[in-house]
């Protein structure tokens, strides 16, 4: 095994370590995607494409993989440099533009899995999912719940997030209802999350969902595990099934 990954030994078989090295992953969105990208790289995924046209802002620093000196610089550029500082030999492709209907086709889609960490301030995340489905690429949807991580995986064929009940004006609240319903169906105490949704509902029209670094750290591990399972052809649950991890009762 490559000396860089020798401490992965036993946890990851040598043949799987080699498999994930060349497994191409697309990360759409370098906010939540910033720590996911680093976690994947440190595991051994060395073929990553990161796409985002946003710049680092002060309000990102409570949770995203950036520092004060990065403010004003494009996230994709900063993240590429950080990833190359970790592994200079990694193949990090950058698309430092906001993804839209006109440029999505410009991204080289020789990928095996996509991570949709785009902001739901428009319909672009849905366009992203539809485009990946046409290319037969499964899509991982991660959600930072503050004190928890939640994700679901969309298969190329089957239900997608547009099938969610549209009970609220903002998509984030509709996803929140889906998450709360999913937790209750598994007999998981969702009271803390329901209380959060009630408070967030008061500001949802003017603010994106509040998030914590803790939730993103949890989520990065969850997403990386799912991508590893996809890469090594291990079992994965697909939407509407989901994954949740938290220490909240």
Predicted feature descriptions by range:
Residues 1-11, 229-249:
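Phosphate-binding loop/pocket of nucleotide- and phosphate-handling active sites
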Residues 1-26, 58:
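N-terminal charged helix/coil linker that caps or initiates catalytic domains
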Residues 25-29, 50:
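Hydrophobic Val/Ile/Leu positions in short beta-strands of Rossmann-like dinucleotide-binding domains
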Residues 32-33:
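Hydrophobic/small residue at the entry helix of a nucleotide-binding pocket
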Residues 47-87:
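Glycine-rich phosphate-binding loop and adjoining beta1-alpha1-beta2 segment
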Residues 102-110:
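Short amphipathic alpha-helix with an adjacent loop that forms part of the alpha/beta core around
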Residues 111-214:
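E1/E1-like adenylate-forming module used to activate ubiquitin-like modifiers
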Residues 156, 219-237:
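Oxidoreductase and adenylate-handling cofactor-binding alpha/beta cores
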């Amino acid at each position: 095994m490559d000396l860089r990954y020798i401490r992965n030994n036993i946890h990851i078989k040598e043949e799987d370590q080699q498999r994930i090295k060349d497994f191409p992953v697309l990360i759409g969105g370098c906010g939540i995607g910033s720590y996911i990208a680093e976690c994947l790289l440190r595991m051994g995924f060395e073929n990553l494409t990161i796409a985002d046209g946003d710049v680092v802002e002060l309000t990102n620093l409570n949770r995203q993989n950036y520092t004060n000196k990065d403010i004003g610089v494009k996230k994709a550029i900063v993240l590429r440099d950080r990833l190359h500082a970790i592994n200079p030999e990694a193949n990090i492709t950058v698309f430092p533009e906001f993804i839209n209907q006109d440029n999505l086709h410009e991204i080289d889609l020789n990928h095996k899995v996509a991570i949709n960490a785009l902001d739901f301030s428009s319909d672009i995340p849905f366009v992203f999912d539809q485009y990946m489905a046409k290319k037969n690429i499964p899509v991982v949807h991660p959600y930072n719940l503050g004190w928890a991580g939640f994700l679901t995986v969309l298969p190329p064929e089957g239900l997608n997030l547009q099938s969610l009940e549209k009970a609220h004006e903002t998509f984030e609240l509709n996803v929140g209802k889906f998450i709360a319903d999913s937790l209750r169906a598994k007999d998981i105490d969702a009271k803390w999350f329901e209380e959060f949704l009630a408070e967030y509902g008061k500001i949802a029209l003017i603010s994106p969902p509040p998030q914590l670094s803790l939730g993103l750290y949890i989520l990065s591990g969850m997403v990386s595990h799912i991508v590893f399972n996809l890469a090594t052809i291990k079992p994965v649950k697909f939407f509407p099934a989901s994954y949740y991890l938290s220490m909240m009762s």
